[in-house]
């Protein structure tokens, strides 16, 4: 399914910030996989190639093959570093290890079992990885629901997520200003998936190493069937984390180390004021949420609507303060652009609320 630890750790942040709308980016993937299974696979097997770039060499020349392979290795090398970095943050914090040492040790372990075991070892570990990801999703959902206020269950959480517009998965708007829509996800996602699954060796090697054309196609179809539901579950987890942080005080900026570093470099009083304002709005929002839920239980529609409107107003103020915090952090890193902390939303939840033995 092309998923990795970085998918599980970072994508919930998208669900936290923008809801389920990010799922539309994957709508084109099933169509791309069908095209690859029908056209790309038979062509690769007919030419008896072992890499996508070997095909470039046979179709064009060795220079084209080397250019494609070199660009792939550069891109994958950078991507692998990020993939190792995210889980290393969690492991180093839980066990008290050095972050640099954890990254190096993880890289060495991966290199050893990959070189020693080849594609068989990679396929085997990917099966375990998928099991761990699904088990982790279930465990995170269970802990989330368990830590919600007493008498507040999953249905109540879904009510809040829906009321706060976090469950709007599909947008058919033709607007070019909307970030995630059905049309951009289907059309753009189709070509992105074609390029990734059809030409990226990290994916091509998976179906070229299978025993037959039929097995390769079955693998792609399995991917197409499970890709969207899996991503939906991860995004829903992010939406539930949003609900959780309506009751538990969240940090104004989830990358706490970056926030502390910028505070030490700038004016600490300004950073504390941002934190105090954010906490005050969160406390008031909690009052309005309780008012909304109580009115909803009584069936008082007008009172519930009034409380929901006030909650939306407070959420807008909260978002504005978080945006200001991102600008304050980003101002010291990349000019005037806001820094992003979405990748740290789920990591923060894991480190602060999940039992370390479960991690």
Question: How would you label these PLM feature ranges?
Answer:
Residues 1-8, 65, 113-117, 136-142:
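Membrane-interface "cap" regions at the ends of multi-pass membrane proteins
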Residues 4, 76, 82, 142-146:
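Hydrophobic alpha-helical transmembrane segments in multi-pass integral membrane proteins
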Residues 4-8, 87, 200:
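Transmembrane helix boundary and interhelical junction motifs in multipass membrane proteins
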Residues 10-24, 131-359:
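Loop-to-helix junctions at membrane interfaces in multi-pass transport proteins
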Residues 11, 40, 90, 107-108, ...:
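Short, hydrophobic/aromatic alpha-helical segments in well-folded domains
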Residues 20-117, 167, 171, 184-196, ...:
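Helix-loop-helix module between adjacent transmembrane segments
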Residues 48, 127, 134-135:
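Membrane-embedded transport cores of multi-pass solute transporters
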């Amino acid at each position: 399914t092309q998923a990795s630890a970085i998918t599980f750790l970072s994508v919930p942040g998208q669900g936290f910030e923008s809801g389920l709308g990010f799922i539309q980016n994957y709508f084109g993937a099933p169509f791309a996989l069908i095209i690859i299974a029908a056209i790309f696979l038979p062509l690769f097997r007919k030419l008896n190639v072992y890499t996508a770039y070997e095909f470039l060499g046979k179709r064009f020349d060795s220079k084209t093959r080397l250019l494609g392979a070199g660009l792939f290795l550069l891109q994958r090398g950078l991507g692998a570093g990020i993939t190792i970095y995210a889980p290393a943050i969690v492991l180093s914090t839980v066990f008290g290890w050095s972050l640099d040492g954890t990254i190096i040790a993880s890289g060495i372990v991966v290199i050893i079992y990959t070189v020693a075991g080849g594609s068989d070892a990679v396929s085997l570990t990917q099966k375990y990885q998928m099991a761990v990801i699904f088990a982790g999703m279930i465990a995170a959902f269970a802990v989330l629901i368990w830590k919600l206020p007493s008498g507040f269950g999953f249905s109540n959480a879904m009510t809040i997520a829906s009321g706060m517009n976090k469950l709007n998965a599909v947008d058919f708007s033709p607007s070019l200003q909307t970030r995630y829509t059905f049309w951009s996800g289907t059309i753009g996602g189709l070509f992105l998936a074609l390029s990734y699954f059809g030409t990226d060796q990290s994916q091509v090697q998976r179906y070229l190493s299978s025993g037959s054309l039929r097995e390769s196609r079955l693998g792609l179809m399995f991917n197409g069937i499970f890709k969207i539901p899996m991503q939906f579950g991860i995004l829903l987890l992010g939406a539930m984390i949003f609900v959780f942080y309506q009751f538990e005080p969240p940090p104004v900026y989830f990358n706490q180390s970056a926030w502390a570093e910028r505070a030490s470099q700038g004016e600490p009083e300004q950073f504390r004021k941002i934190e105090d304002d954010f906490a005050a709005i969160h406390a008031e929002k909690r009052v309005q949420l309780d008012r909304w839920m109580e009115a909803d239980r009584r069936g008082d529609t007008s009172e519930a609507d009034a409380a929901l409107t006030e909650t939306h107003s407070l959420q807008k103020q909260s978002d504005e303060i978080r945006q200001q915090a991102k600008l304050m952090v980003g101002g010291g890193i990349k000019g005037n652009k806001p820094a992003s902390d979405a990748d740290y939303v789920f990591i923060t939840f894991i480190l602060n609320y999940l039992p370390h033995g479960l991690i």
